[in-house]
């Protein structure tokens, strides 16, 4: 039977060292959709450069990604671990630019910093310093969390995702 569903686009924004967390985000979103799509009529679609972009010319890479899908997202989840990312014309990394676009648009950003152990071969001093400076920039704004394990991240993210989108659903219903 056909059903009306409100679709939210969730941007996954992270440097290339974040791989396991992308899988965990996808799993958390799948779990959310399984629980709430039929009962509440809301669903979330994840958007990530690896699956939501296409080859395009005629502009700067990050600007093209922003136009293709970033600007169309309703919320974002951003994660940092050992790398800050590739600089853009405007920001220290594409991830930083995506976060700023979302925040300037008044959209929800779930921001996380990994405190998982780092193998010595993955340590990038310059990248780590940039991450710490970025983290310090937001420390008084209360918009990020840290985690020390994959399981902790998945539980925390699922809880935050659920609280936000269930609140969105309640607010939209009371506005009717």
Where are the language model's segments positioned?
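Conserved catalytic or regulatory cores that recognize and/or transform ribose-phosphate-containing ligands
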Residues: 1-176
């Amino acid at each position: 039977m056909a059903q009306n569903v409100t679709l939210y686009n969730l941007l996954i924004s992270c440097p290339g060292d974040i791989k396991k967390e992308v899988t965990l985000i996808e799993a958390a979103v799948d779990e959310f959709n399984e629980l709430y799509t039929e009962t509440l009529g809301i669903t979330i679609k994840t958007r990530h450069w690896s699956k939501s972009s296409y080859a395009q010319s005629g502009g700067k890479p990050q600007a093209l990604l922003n136009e293709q899908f970033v600007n169309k997202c309703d919320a974002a989840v951003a994660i940092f671990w050992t790398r800050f990312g590739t600089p853009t014309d405007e920001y220290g990394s594409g991830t930083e630019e995506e976060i700023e676009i979302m925040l300037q648009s008044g959209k929800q950003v779930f921001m996380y910093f990994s405190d998982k152990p780092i193998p010595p071969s993955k340590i990038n001093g310059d990248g780590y310093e940039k991450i710490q400076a970025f983290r310090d920039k937001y420390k008084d704004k209360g918009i990020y969390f840290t985690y020390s394990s994959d399981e902790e991240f998945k539980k925390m993210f699922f809880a935050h995702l659920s609280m936000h989108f269930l609140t969105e659903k309640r607010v939209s219903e009371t506005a009717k």
